[in-house]
Amino acid sequence: MNTESLALDFKSATLYAIRVVLHDADTTRLRAALDKRMADAGSFFENEPVVIDATRVDAPVDWPALLQALADHNLPPIGVVAEGANLQGARDAGLVPVELSTSVARAPQVIDTAPPNDVATPVPSVPEATAEATAKAGPQDDEADGEQADEAPAHNPESVPTRAARETTEANRPTATPPQSSSALVITKPLRSGQRVYARHTDLIVIGMVSQGAEVIADGNVHVYGPLRGKAMAGARGDTSARIFTTQLDAELLAVAGVYRVVEDKLDRALHNQPALVRLDGDTLRIEALKG
C-alpha cells in the first residue's frame, strides 16, 4: 500500500520523563513535598512530562488530588507505574500504565531527597522526557547562536525531565543515543537572574558570572569562567559523561544527566567559592575541587 496517500503513519519514538516516586499516599504530605521540590528547583522542571511511580506505597492514592497537584506545578503526567488497587485507581483517573527500564540515561527525581554533604544519590530506574522548553537566553545573550541557544529540554523535555536521577523510561521503545556535539556555544556576558541559556547538542561556555536565579543548560559540558551562583545542568539529554566546570562554585542547583542536587547549605570550605567540577560517578553526583 502506498503510505504517501494516508493521512497518518506510525513512527517509532523515544520518550523521556521525570519519574515522580511516591513514598507516601497522604495527599497533604505529597503536595507539601512537591511544593518544596519545585520551590527548590525554580522553573527547572516546569512543563516536563512525568511518570508517577506508586510501587512503594500500599495505601490508596487519591489520584485526582495528586494529578491536580502536579498540574498546579505544570507537570503533565503521561503514565503511571503502580500495582493492585492503585493501578486500577490510576487507570480510572485516566493514567496509562507504562513499564520502566534501566538504561544509559537518567531523568530527574522530583520527590526523592538528596543526601547531605557533597553527593546526591538517585533512585535506580527513572524515566525521561523529550520536548523542547521555552526559555531563551535573555537580551544580553546576543552572542548566542540562534539554533543552539533556543530552548532548554528541562522544561519541555526530550528527556520524560523532570528540570533529576536520569534512567530511561521509555514508552515501550529503546533509548536513543545522545546526539553528537558540535562547536561550543560561547556566551561572553554575565547572565542576570531569570535568564536561561541552553546549548543544544553541544557544550556551553559562559565567560562571566551566572547570577542567582539564572540557568545554564547544555547537552554537553557546562563551563563557567566566573562565579556560578545560579543553576547549572550538563548532559541535559542524558549524557552521563558530561561535566560542570566553574572557577567559582556557589550554585543553587547542580545537575548532570538529570541527577541533581539542590545546594541548600553552603558547601565545604574547600569547595565553596572555589574552582570545582561536578560529575557523575555511577549514580552519584560528585562535587570536587579543581586543583592546579
UniProtKB/Swiss-Prot annotation:
Coiled coil: none annotated. GO terms for biological process: cell morphogenesis; division septum assembly; regulation of cell division; regulation of cell septum assembly. Residues 140-150 have a biased composition (Acidic residues). Gene3D superfamilies: 2.160.20.70, 3.30.70.260. InterPro entries: CAP/MinC_C, MinC, MinC_C_sf, MinC_N, Septum_form_inhib_MinC_C. Keywords: Cell cycle, Cell division, Septation. Residues 109-188 are annotated as: Disordered. It comes from the Bacteria. Residues 171-185 have a biased composition (Polar residues). The keyword Metal-binding does not apply. The keyword Thylakoid does not apply. Cell division inhibitor that blocks the formation of polar Z ring septums. Rapidly oscillates between the poles of the cell to destabilize FtsZ filaments that have formed before they mature into polar Z rings. Prevents FtsZ polymerization. Belongs to the MinC family. PANTHER family: SEPTUM SITE-DETERMINING PROTEIN MINC (PTHR34108:SF1). Interacts with MinD and FtsZ. This is Probable septum site-determining protein MinC. The lineage of its organism: Bacteria, Pseudomonadati, Pseudomonadota, Betaproteobacteria, Burkholderiales. The gene is minC.
